[in-house]
Amino acid sequence: MNDLLLWSLLLLTVTTVLLVLPFYPAWSEWRRPRDRQAQAVDPPAALDTGPRALQLAPGACFNTVHARHLMLGSGAMPAPSVQPTLQRWQPPAGARPWGLHGWHIGHHLDIPANQLVPCSLVVRGRLRALGPGRIEGDIKARDSLHLGPGTKLQGNLFCEGDIWLDAGCSVSGLVMAEGSLHLAPGVVIGTPQHPVSVCADVMDVRGPVLVHGSVQARIRGSVACA
């Protein structure tokens, strides 16, 4: 019995030593630290967060493309046109307030040229802005949406049908069409500081068109040949 107890104590001692021994350096450093300060550790290499440029040449077909600087088509982007003096747009009769700074239009809406629209618009029909002009807010149209040449939209663009953006148009926010999206030369969507998404069933691009962000053609997208 005594021998069994002795061997048990010996086995327990050896096991305890083997378990504690790996922690001795840490315990010794804790009791009498030799490092006066924490050792510097080299930081991991920073990720490349800079803009990534990509160009789709005329004749290219695509579905989903991501890039901070996406050029669709070839040739130089035309210089931004100088907008004329704009007149403050007035909502038509029957328009209802929508949100904090918007209007709900229950029928088709045509916006004349040289207009400043300082609000968001919800149109239960077709919307057409003749351009040039500036719209400071989001736009949502049910049937179709057409921005004429030189129209600047500071907001997002939504349509349950087709969208046309004529030459020189710019949209600072995202663009979403449940139908087709037609982009004319000189169109700019998004900004380098604020990449956005462009989405439609079908995209018809006549470049050069510049998009900051991503484009998604659910069925097909194509860049027309020059």
Label the model's feature ranges.
Residues 1-29:
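N-terminal signal-anchor transmembrane alpha helix of single-pass membrane proteins
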